[in-house]
């Protein structure tokens, strides 16, 4: 009989959000007349903007004509989108990229999970705690995480982020090969300054580490002093891979498109000590395992960068951030300690009286019919917190805050 990859058996039986869905469904069955408002899973609610819809319709029409039909596209992505990415997302910030450093994908989740394939299985990893579960789970699958004991993986360096340090992780006192950073942060909604980010780049240069930088929420940054890209830091091209997504930027959760930057200067070593550029390695991996993002999705993404597209996408982002600002203010009125929600669509809320995350989740669900995400699902340091998202309708966010206030007796 064929042997299974036993590393998969180390994973928890349920993905965090699948577990939440089961609990919510059980509640709905028991309370069929009660409308549940979800501020948990971070899916968007607003429709695609008109510029994107127009571009998609045009692309569909092109697929209906033999002269303009498109089959397999280039694995890295079409030039029209990669050039638009460089021109709009990087050049205005003084970052110069070559088109061959841009890899279009079907959403950041794919590449953040798959990028570890091009690095040896015995590299050690460092993660902020709390953290987006995919970063660790994808490393568990390859055998890099070790053994799960007392809520932690034995071969993972956890870098706790809490209120005492504004949720900014401390630089490790030992060498870490692969470092996962996400800013604006999911789940805490906090950001990192250029000064703090520079410390990480310098650490990576000194220790020959690689930073895997998830910038999926950079479009929500409003503070001009906060970096949108790690490549705003001198030297980062030598040590960092950056991931971007259109899911929350432009509502592409159902369209699927994003991109990854792999600089040509970025290198890793063989066991013999030979330096090897990772850009062609990732390109080779993509050519083998990925047939490219759909033409229709890439035309949709290109439309985001038109004058009309920029204006419309910004309006949607502002819609969600209005929710975030409102929710933050209302929760603070209730005496809760709230973080995030200023440069990110996530709010990280301290539970009253240090109530365990899952217990508070259950109490809020049954007491207010409002769904949150238990902070402990993002790591040990998330215990005693919940995450709320601002991706709902204005009316739902308002009603959810009213329900929570009534439930808490405020």
Model-inferred region functions:
Residues 2-106, 304-308, 410:
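N-terminal small-domain helix-loop-helix segment of the aminotransferase-like
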Residues 149, 232-318, 325, 329, ...:
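Conserved core segment of the aminotransferase class I/II
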Residues 87, 91, 95, 354, ...:
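PLP-dependent enzyme catalytic core of the Aspartate aminotransferase-like
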Residues 65-204, 218-233:
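Conserved core of the PLP fold type I
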Residues 298, 302, 317-328, 338-350, ...:
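Conserved glycine-rich beta-strand-loop-beta hairpin in the small C-terminal domain of fold type I
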Residues 123, 206-210, 237-238:
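A short helix->loop->beta-strand "cap" motif at the edges of active sites that frequently abuts
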Residues 31, 206-207, 334, 368:
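Helix C-cap/helix->beta junction micro-motif
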């Amino acid at each position: 009989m064929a042997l299974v990859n036993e590393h998969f058996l180390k994973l928890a039986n349920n993905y965090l959000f699948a577990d939440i869905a089961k609990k919510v469904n059980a509640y709905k069955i028991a309370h069929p007349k009660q409308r549940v408002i979800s501020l948990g899973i971070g899916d968007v609610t607003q429709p695609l903007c008109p510029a994107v819809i127009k571009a998609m319709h045009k692309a569909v029409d092109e697929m209906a004509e033999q002269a303009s039909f498109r089959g397999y596209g280039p694995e890295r992505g079409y030039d029209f989108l990669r050039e638009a990415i460089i021109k709009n997302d990087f050049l205005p910030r003084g970052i110069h990229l070559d088109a061959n450093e841009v890899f279009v994908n079907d959403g950041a989740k794919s590449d953040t999970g798959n990028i570890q394939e091009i690095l040896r299985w015995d590299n050690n990893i460092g993660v902020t705690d709390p953290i987006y579960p995919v970063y660790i789970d994808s490393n568990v699958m390859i055998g890099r995480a070790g053994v799960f004991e007392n809520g932690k993986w034995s071969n993972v360096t956890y870098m706790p982020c809490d209120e005492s340090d504004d949720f900014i992780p401390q630089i490790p006192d030992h060498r870490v090969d692969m470092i996962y950073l996400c800013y604006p942060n999911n789940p805490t909604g906090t950001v990192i300054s250029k000064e703090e980010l520079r410390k990480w780049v310098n650490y990576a240069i000194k220790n020959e580490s690689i930073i895997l930088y998830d910038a999926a929420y950079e479009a929500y940054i409003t503070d001009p002093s906060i970096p949108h890209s790690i490549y705003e830091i001198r030297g980062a091209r030598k040590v960092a891979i950056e991931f971007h997504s259109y899911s929350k930027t432009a509502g592409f959760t159902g369209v699927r498109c994003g991109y990854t930057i792999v600089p040509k200067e970025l290198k890793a070593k063989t066991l013999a000590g030979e330096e090897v550029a990772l850009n062609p390695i990732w390109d080779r991996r993509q050519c083998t395992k990925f047939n490219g993002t759909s033409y229709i999705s890439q035309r949709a993404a290109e439309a985001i960068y038109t004058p009309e597209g920029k204006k419309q996408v910004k309006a949607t982002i502002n819609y969600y951030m209005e929710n975030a600002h409102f929710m933050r203010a209302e929760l603070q009125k209730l005496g809760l300690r709230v973080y995030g929600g200023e440069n990110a669509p996530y709010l990280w809320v301290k539970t009253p009286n240090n109530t365990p995350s899952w217990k508070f989740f259950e109490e809020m669900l049954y007491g207010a019919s409002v769904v949150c995400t238990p902070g402990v699902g993002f790591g040990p340091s998330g215990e005693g917190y919940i995450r709320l998202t601002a991706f709902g309708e204005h009316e739902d966010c308002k009603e959810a805050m009213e329900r929570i206030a009534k439930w808490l007796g405020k």
